[in-house]
Swiss-Prot record:
This is Sesquiterpene synthase 14b. Mg(2+) 1 binds at D305, D309. Binds 3 Mg(2+) or Mn(2+) ions per subunit. CDD domains: Terpene_cyclase_plant_C1. Sesquiterpene synthase involved in the biosynthesis of volatile compounds. Mediates the conversion of (2E,6E)-farnesyl diphosphate ((EE)-FPP) into (+)-thujopsene, beta-bisabolene, alpha-cederene, beta-acoradiene, (E)-gamma-bisabolene, (Z)-alpha-bisabolene, (Z)-beta-farnesene and (E)-beta-farnesene, and of (2Z,6Z)-farnesyl diphosphate ((ZZ)-FPP) into (E)-gamma-bisabolene, (E)-alpha-bisabolene, (E)-beta-farnesene, (Z)-beta-farnesene, beta-bisabolene, beta-acoradiene and alpha-acoradiene. Its cofactor is Mg(2+); Mn(2+). The gene is TPS14b. It comes from Solanum habrochaites (Wild tomato).
Amino acid sequence: MNQLAMVNTTITRPLANYHSSVWGNYFLSYTPQLTEISSQEKRELEELKEKVRQMLVETPDNSTQKLVLIDTIQRLGVAYHFENHIKISIQNIFDEFEKNKNKDNDDDLCVVALRFRLVRGQRHYMSSDVFTRFTNDDGKFKETLTKDVQGLLNLYEATHLRVHGEEILEEALSFTVTHLKSMSPKLDNSLKAQVSEALFQPIHTNIPRVVARKYIRIYENIESHDDLLLKFAKLDFHILQKMHQRELSELTRWWKDLDHSNKYPYARDKLVECYFWAIGVYFGPQYKRARRTLTKLIVIITITDDLYDAYATYDELVPYTNAVERCEISAMHSISPYMRPLYQVFLDYFDEMEEELTKDGKAHYVYYAKIETNKWIKSYLKEAEWLKNDIIPKCEEYKRNATITISNQMNLITCLIVAGEFISKETFEWMINESLIAPASSLINRLKDDIIGHEHEQQREHGASFIECYVKEYRASKQEAYVEARRQITNAWKDINTDYLHATQVPTFVLEPALNLSRLVDILQEDDFTDSQNFLKDTITLLFVDSVNSTSCG
């Protein structure tokens, strides 16, 4: 008999009635034969890569052409092939600027803004004072700049790398948004597409794979595009897409074996969406293990979230929480029978992680994963306790707990553990206890989730979100609560940018997962993860289904 059928039917459960999977077993059709990368494709990619490398080498560092070339390569999603060259070039560009900044009289907004964004994107602090020359005595940007659409667009993109206290960039953001929106309908199709995409989602807060997929289409329609670069970007995307399709096929088989419909019918069926989350953090060929591990973790998190949120009773959750903290097979007998399949998946996950890390001589990393897991599962029980006792906590108390339940920190630490890079104990400790970027990323994930999901959640018995907490504590309207949540998200992005620019003792590969986890939730317009039949479905189709060579792409 189904274990769920054996559960006491007199118990009232706050079922969420989630829709069935959009994808089902679709990706099982991507067999190893269909996703095989041919020797001809590999050879052609290497030949094109060498030609693009020559373009980079032959273009002088301190030229506008070099800035545009690097920007194009990054947008097309192929910069990972040339990381070292780009790093050195941007360093040279920054050094030259610093040496001559008092003599610098560059009045080309397009160049100044692009250079600013690329330099900050490589973690060099270039002062926002470079934009002062484009303002009047009253600190407002000159209206004559509205004739330079590309300059406005570059300035708009640059503003998203601002840190606290940069009022000139706040002014620049308001100025560029106002004018880009008003002029967009009058632009030619190619420029209109760039402006529309930027206003919808700026580069800095978008995930690299989505940027690449959409920019390939935009770049193809720019008359001055470079055919060689476009061909390279398309082939590279095609090869990575095959690899991602194969991984999705393997993970779909794993998911099918878990028997979701019988063992976890109360939970969302989101395997493909979980993989999308993983690829948003790591898309490169060297990160296959990281994507697989992270996907499995997010699947476990999703089922657990629905268990605590939409099915189990408080009395069932107390022993389950204790069992997860113990992480031992002997705890199995202490939990309800219907919870045991999920607990077994949880144990298998950690066994697999430990086995793989032991091969790498990094078994001690598992300690950090288990510490974060224990914090996470206890925070879920705290939310269940609040719900049981009809407690709406103060905003700060809510955030302390809810930024753990959102699981961002656990995902982040897992990324660092399984990515394959060496990370010192000091770096782990810094990320967990001292960084701005980790708590800021968690806060963005939590508040964005509360903004887009709380109306749906309040239709059933559910714990308070930040919105309800703020309304109660400050006797505010829901609209005022939304405004405050968005203000805190904006400030959290400034914290992320601050660490990215100033935590120079920490390698970039340590910070990028936190940045990408923030980007992932930032691109969701509604509760797309839960109700993934619209925007997220279209995005997944772009990345994993549609051919990049299709005339209807994007």
